[in-house]
Amino acid sequence: MRQYTRRNVLKMLGVGAVTVVGLGLVGCSGAGEGGAASSASEPVPASQAFAQAGVWMQYDGDEQIGKDVEIERILSFDGNGNVAVYQCNGATFGDLNGLSNEQIIELAKELDRAVFEAEKQAAIESADEAIQAWQQCYDALKAEADAGTYDSMNNYGAYGIEGVPEEERAAAIEEFQIALENTKSSLDAANEGQAFNEAAEYQEPQPQPYTLALETDGSGNVAAGEEIRFPARRFSFYQIEVDDTTDLESPETRFRVLADYGWHNDAEIPENVFSAPEDSIGLYSFNYSTTQAVYDTTFGGYSGLATVVEEGHAGFTWDTTDAEGVEVD
């Protein structure tokens, strides 16, 4: 996956070095766009934090936020109970310094598209390699069958139809033809899958409803954990590969691979490029959440999920069991 330097990020946003200086204060106070969640004298419950329009960054919760810590996804809350989730492998917290919420969202869109294009290209290249190997294999076997020589056949210690006893040749040829037909059918399926990959077009993620779920302790009265659940979009491409193309290229192994193991293309063509299974993020550090400055920007939140806050922010906490709109076990 491509790594994005701060210069790359600024180019993607069309922001020059001089402009960044002017935005330096926006990074520190830009969270003011998100309302009270950015400046709080008391810890903010999750239901209040996510109910406001704002941008949150998901990262590895085992790491301390820092300029080189990678951001896995960016979550954009619309203030109406919905969240749009962007994949952004390669960006870091340092890349967000001085950016407003709007600019972070624009960056998220560019990064999400980049992830899509990278996965699409990887799927196309992998399938293309497999298709080329199998096509060459099929062409070679077809030429042998058309010539009546069946040179790749080696069931009796010698290659070709001449090595097969006369009384068993019909059965051997039938076996060869079955392998050839199966190869052609699977090759056709692979080409269809590749066409699916090539036709795939990027679409921006749309805001989807999220829910907050609270887990209680043995008494049922005290919060013991909380998580946010949401549909997390995935990119689905046709995936197929050949483990060892040399087996299909060699006349000594080509037919054996097809006849003994068969080539069954079990890879399925996805119904849609985009799927959205439910995902969740645990909201840890319930008593308090530390804040961390990166350059001129201060981040705070839960372990693994952070937003831009003002210096001195009191942090974020779990909801109580009577919080409105929160599912309780």
Describe each model-derived feature in a short phrase.
Residues I228-T291:
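Mature extracytoplasmic/lumenal regions of exported proteins
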Residues G24-G27:
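C-terminal motif of bacterial Sec signal peptides marking the signal peptidase cleavage site
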Residues S29-A37:
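Bacterial lipoprotein signal-peptidase II cleavage site
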Residues M1-G16:
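N-terminal secretory signal peptides and thylakoid transit peptides that target proteins
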Residues A40-E70:
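Tryptophan-anchored aromatic micro-motifs
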Residues I269-D329:
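Edge beta-strand at a domain terminus
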Residues Q64-V164, R169-I240, D244:
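N-terminal glycine/threonine-rich, aromatic-flanked beta-hairpin/loop signature
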Residues K184, A195, A200-Y202, P207, ...:
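A eukaryote-biased sequence property
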